[in-house]
Each structure stands twice: as C-alpha cells, then as structure tokens.
Amino acid sequence: MLKNPSVKYRAFAPVPLSDRQWPSKTITKPPIWMSTDLRDGNQALFEPMNAERKLRMFEMLVKIGFKEIEAGFPSASDTDFGFIRKLVEEGRVPDDVHIEVLTQARPELIARTMESLKGAKNAIVHVYNATAPNFREVVFQQGKQGVKAIATESARQIKEIAATQPETNWTFQYSPEVFSGTELDFAKEVVDAVTEIWEAGPERKVVINLPATVEMATPNIYADQIEWMHRNLERRDGIILSVHPHNDRGTAVAAAELAIMAGADRVEGCLFGNGERTGNVDLVTLALNLYSQGIDPGLDFAQINEIARTAEYCTQLPIHPRHPYVGDLVFTAFSGSHQDAIKKGLAAYKAGDIWQVPYLPLDPKDLGRTYESIIRVNSQSGKGGVSYLLEAEYDLRLPRRLQVEFSSAVQRVTDDTGKEVRAADIWRIFEEEYLTRAEPIEYLSHSLYDESGKQGVKIRIRRFGKEEELSGSGNGPIDAAMDALKLGVELRHYEEHSIGSGTDAKAVAFMEVADPEHPGDLFGVGIDANIITASFKAMLSAANRAAARRPKSEWARLCGGAE
C-alpha cells in the first residue's frame, strides 16, 4: 500500500446541496422491490444457473412476493432468451407480476429484446448506456452529445417497437449506467431527454434507475445525488425513481436506505447480496430492517431457512454464517453474559408485547427459526467445544446447522446433571439422538436397480414393528428412497464425508429435513461402510426424530404405513 494514497486516488467531490432534506426524513413504507437475481445475480456466478435452477429461483421470488422480476438479458444469451420465452409461452408469470429484461442501447439488441417479450401480459424493458466521464472518454471515446444521442435513439426505438406489440402492458426503464460517477447536470440532461420521448406522466409512468454501478463514496453522498435528481428532474410526477446500489465499499444497504429517504421509490437488488464483484444490495436485509422497525416490507420471509437453502442451491454459493438475519450463527449466543440476558428477555416476553429481547433485533420465530438454537455451549468452559471433540476423537465433522442443533441436546444433559461432559459422553448423546432411534421406522436392507433411465430401489424396513419391502424410483438413490417411503418430510440439504481411512473407513451422511407441521428444520444422521446405506439411515433418522416431536397418534401420517 502507498504511504500517500492521495497521489493515486481522489476523494469524491461533495454534492452542492446545502439545503438537503433527507437527513430529517424517516422511512414509513417499503419501496417497490425489483429482484435482479436472475440477471445481475446470475451473470456474476462461477456457473450461471441452468433452466431448472432459474425456474426454481423465479418461482421462489414470486412466492416471496416480488411483483417485478428481472428475468434475464435476452439479447446477450440464447439461454436467457429461451428462458424468457418459456416463462411467457407457458404462462408462468402471474398476472400481477411484471417480467423485466435488460438491453444495451444498441438497435439490433433492442429488437431482439423486444422479440423475447412477445405475448407477455406485463413487461418492463430496461435500456441502459454508460454516462460517466471515464466511460465516455476511455471506453466509448464519445462526447456528451454522442452519449445522449445513444440514449434518445434507443428510447425512440423502444417506443416504436412497443406500439407494434399492443397486447403487452409496457413499462419503459432507463438507466444512466455509472450514474454515481456521472456529473449530475449531465445525468439530468440525458434523463430529461429520454422521459420527453417516452411522454412520461402520471398516467404513463416510466422507471428512471440511478445505479451506483460501482460504489464510489459514502452513503450520504449517494443520498445527496438522489435527492438532487429527485428535486430537479422534469416530469417527476411521471417517474418512478429507482436505485441500484452495489456493495463495493460495503455500505449498499445504508446507501439504499438513505436513497429512499432522499426520494427513491424503488430498489433493485438480489437476495442475500448476490451480484457482480462484492454484490448488489441485499434485499433480504433491507426488507427485514424495515420489518424490525414495525413496517410491513410486503415480502414474505417467514420461512427464511427454506429460502436460504433454495438460494444456495440455485446460485451454488454459500451464505455466510454471520449474514444478517439468515446466517446460521446470527441467532446464536456463545458469551455467557449474552446467554443470560437472552434467557431473561425471553422469559419476560409475552405474546403481543413489543419485542425487547436483548441481543435479538427481531423474533427468530417470525422467520421460521426456533429458540432452541439461540443458547448453546461453545467451548465446554474453555476445554474444547462439542463439535471440536467429536471431530478430534471420532473424525465426525458436523455441518454448521447440525452443530447448533446438537449442542442443544448436550446442553440439556449438562443442565440436568450439572456435570462436565467428556468426549465419550458427547458421543453417547450423539448416538442416542441420531444413530440408534428405531421408532417408528428401522432400516433393514436395500437393493438398487435401473428402471427406464431412472434409479430404482427396493428397501426393507421395520415399521411399527412389522417388516415391509417398498419400491420406488427417482433421479438417484435418495430420490428413489423418498419415493418409496412416502415420508411426510421435505429434504432441505444433504452432505456426506468419510470417517477414517483404508479398509476400516466408513461414511457418514447428514440429511436436513423440514416437517411442514413444525417450525424449524432438523437433521438425521447415518453411518455405514456403504454411503448409500448411510444415506438411507440418515433419512430414517430424520423421520424418527421428526416423529418424536409429535404424539404417537400422528406417527402414521408422518412416516407412512399404519400402526
């Protein structure tokens, strides 16, 4: 690093806005939310989503409550074009959802983009071109008027093509890319020219999106830029003012919140902050920040674990255990004083009261999470944690969420006995909790076979004391076994690893499932010399543990068969 960074880097100039109003404003309602997980988020992945993952992400976004979803960049990719056609032609876009597509400001790309939306009921066509000096001068070698002409010619072309597709309810959107690095008077000049062509008005609103394509300054600077545009743009009553913050400086959430205070009506971003470089603004954090202040965000995150696991599956990116609201450790206290304060706060809280539990900004139950994982041991009074001892003594590496779950079982034992637990005690607790449960279902044996290109399985079990042989098929052994057993749980996550090495090696399988009738996911564990057998044992372990939370009268409904 340089001793004097000022010789290489320049401080961002403040905005001349001496009478700024945003510092005295408060947020009282949610913005319009636009998810760009399928476009900006997808293009930033090591391996972009395939059609199956894209569709799963789209359906989840709809379920959460997004009414505007940017589904792709159809002129840049045949895959994106085909996916958008699939959504339109198969009627997968609900009537109250606007599908959005992005295009560069080039005639042939605009034409291809508009073609992708033929037959759509509600569509947003989003065109952009870079307006910042370094892009004008270095990348495009254009003057201001040349850049402005690109924007206006594109706006005119979009308007003309839209008139030939009257079956679609169109919304036009323009972004001066790298707005945060563009001179404000020039950004206004370009935007005003575009909104004039589109005849923006109260009955014909357009979206003007002001992106921090690269986050260049502190959030207050971005707020000043947004307020300046909010106060100076022509045809403001015909504009939905949108922001698209990136997280290069780590303050995208704050920038978005201050931008809303400064006059923004709409926010574009991704679940859990996915996106180019350091990511887009995290819409989950933004929404739950509002929720924790008593404002309904209009998005449903009541099953945050399911949403997180689906996002991880679709993006193939892990969510950090410290991620706000959703990370595996955010509702977990390791400090003894924190544990004591939380216990007392939970004991004092009564349903209907204002939430004031120390260290917990909102009630985990509101997100479908449970209190059991909040208080946990972490280091056996400084002599090594539960998970450390299991790994050190038994070569068992528990997934993070299972560490949280199992530590509660250990805590119950230490609370009951008041004694220190050693590695052998922890292993005994683990066996009893996960490995030796045989009610109501016990694994006996299985065989695999091919069935019309799918995996078939015959699995022998003892259920409610009676031996049975069941058959099923699926995309793999686990899917086939789930088909055969007809268990009333949903698979959330699966992982495995080996224990030991050489001829004595075994496999351990961890299966995380959800019981639709009980909040909070739970794990099953199986250990065997054969990995498939270990997987089946883990499946039944999870089902038996789910059954243990229910009265016996409900076991048949959960585990199939008849008592």
Curated annotation (Swiss-Prot):
InterPro entries: 2-isopropylmalate_synth_dimer (IPR013709), AIPM/Hcit_synth_CS (IPR002034), Aldolase_TIM (IPR013785), IPM_Synthase (IPR005668), LeuA-like_post-cat (IPR054692), LeuA_allosteric_dom_sf (IPR036230), LeuA_N_DRE-TIM (IPR039371), PYR_CT (IPR000891)
A Pfam family annotated for this UniProt entry: HMGL-like
Function: Catalyzes the condensation of the acetyl group of acetyl-CoA with 3-methyl-2-oxobutanoate (2-ketoisovalerate) to form 3-carboxy-3-hydroxy-4-methylpentanoate (2-isopropylmalate).
Metabolic or biological pathway, per its Swiss-Prot or TrEMBL entry: Amino-acid biosynthesis; L-leucine biosynthesis; L-leucine from 3-methyl-2-oxobutanoate: step 1/4
Region of interest called Regulatory domain, as start-end residue ranges on this chain: 437-563
Gene3D superfamilies in alphabetical order: 3.30.160.270, Aldolase class I
Main location: cytoplasm
NCBIfam families recorded: leuA_yeast (TIGR00970), PRK03739.1 (NF002991)
Protein name in the entry: 2-isopropylmalate synthase
SMART domains (alphabetical): LeuA_dimer (SM00917)
Known cofactor(s): Mg(2+)
